[in-house]
A protein has these predicted regions:
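A residue-level signal for conserved active-site and pocket-lining positions in enzyme catalytic cores
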Residues: 78, 160
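Active-site-proximal, acidic helix/loop segment immediately C-terminal to a metal-coordinating Asp/Glu
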Residues: 1-9, 69, 93, 97-154, ...
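Active-site metal-binding loops of divalent metal-dependent hydrolases
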Residues: 56, 105, 161
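Catalytic core of PPM/PP2C metal-dependent serine/threonine phosphatase domains
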Residues: 1-66, 72, 86, 151-158, ...
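Short gly/ser/thr-rich secondary-structure transition/capping motifs
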Residues: 31-32, 80-85, 145
Length: 169
């Protein structure tokens, strides 16, 4: 479904709207839903367009400002509300900006004391790594290492912990 929608070239909010209509039919009576953050990047304009269906907002490291911006746009989960609306936002990216996309399994991971890794800890880790000018792959490796260190040897994930780092060169 997603691939077919992406190939239409529609803006992110329209893609989420169409996916929601399809999900309502597929998930009807299942009491399930989907969260999704969708973005597309235009290398000519250096603009990242995005829409959000109640997913964790990615973290944008603005290299020039040395600060984090949460990429969020209003939107309801997919598959529950037929008339759900989604907003499309866009932001211009600059050289050395990085975007961290992540699932809730990353911030919901807990240690032996029951403490969650949480978004604040992820943001602090991401800022520290960005300031040290690591590559996107090094950042991923170091965040996963931090998660492993945090959870200890008895790591048990309740949910997937997935991440992608997009770096503009």
């Amino acid at each position: 479904m997603l691939r077919a929608e992406v190939l239409t070239g529609l803006p992110p909010d329209r893609i989420l709207h169409d996916l929601n209509q399809l999900a309502i039919n597929d998930l009807d009576q299942s009491h399930r839903f989907v969260t999704l953050f969708y973005s597309d990047y235009d290398p000519r304009t250096k603009k990242l367009r995005f829409a959000n269906a109640a997913h964790n907002p990615p973290l944008l490291w603005k290299s020039s400002d040395q600060k984090i911006v949460k990429l969020d746009a209003e939107g309801f989960v997919l598959g529950l509300q037929k008339d759900a609306e989604y907003n499309c936002s866009e932001i211009k990216l600059n050289e050395n900006d990085l975007v961290l996309y992540y699932t809730d399994g990353v911030i919901d991971t807990s240690n032996s004391l029951g403490e969650r890794f949480d978004e604040e800890r992820l943001i602090k880790t991401f800022i520290k790594l960005c300031k040290q000018s690591y590559t996107s792959q090094e950042i991923l490796n170091k965040i996963f290492k931090k998660l492993d260190d945090f959870t200890g040897q008895n790591r048990h994930l309740e949910d997937d912990a997935s991440m992608v780092v997009f770096q503009l060169k």
